[in-house]
């Protein structure tokens, strides 16, 4: 639990799971929910004052979204893909 709280405070966390998945429960309470299908149009909603960590349920969508977000933000902030390591926080 300590690691989860520490992790949540030092990064902006973006959850790219579908709305129905998020309704079943957030993995990080302070994450921003932006489904992968909406990521391109909603990048401007992501704060850039801290490094960004992108997660989904297993790694595939977060890989695509982190690449897209990094590209849209032109490298102005570090963007990390949590990948399948998200399972360690569930």
Task: Name each region found by the language model.
Residues 1-12, 16-90:
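Rhodanese-like catalytic fold shared by cysteine-dependent sulfurtransferases
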